């Protein structure tokens, strides 16, 4: 079987709270690091989440 082009990633909060979301991304369309603004329930604000590897 062929290997899929979607890779599981972890979005880690830049607020330093330790909160994270998991998602997947298309490696072919988005080869760079992924950044998105999402809600962090620990600080109760929208902050930038940055891509990190799932261990």
UniProtKB/Swiss-Prot annotation:
Tagged with keyword rRNA-binding: no
UniProt keywords, alphabetically: Ribonucleoprotein, Ribosomal protein
Record-linked NCBIfam families: PRK00595.1, rpmG_bact
Record field: transmembrane: none
Any matching Pfam family: Ribosomal_L33
Listed GO CC annotations: cytosolic large ribosomal subunit
Any one GO molecular function term: structural constituent of ribosome
One Gene Ontology term from the biological process aspect of the record: translation
Gene3D superfamilies in UniProt: Ribosomal protein L33
UniProt superkingdom: Bacteria
Record-stated family: Belongs to the bacterial ribosomal protein bL33 family.
Protein name: Large ribosomal subunit protein bL33
InterPro entries for this protein: Ribosomal_bL33, Ribosomal_bL33_CS, Ribosomal_bL33_sf, Ribosomal_zn-bd
């Amino acid at each position: 079987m062929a290997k899929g082009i979607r890779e599981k990633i972890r979005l880690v909060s830049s607020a330093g709270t330790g909160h994270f979301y998991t998602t997947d991304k298309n490696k072919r369309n988005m080869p760079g690091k992924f950044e998105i603004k999402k809600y962090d329930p620990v600080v109760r604000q929208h902050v930038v989440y940055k891509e990190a590897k799932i261990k």
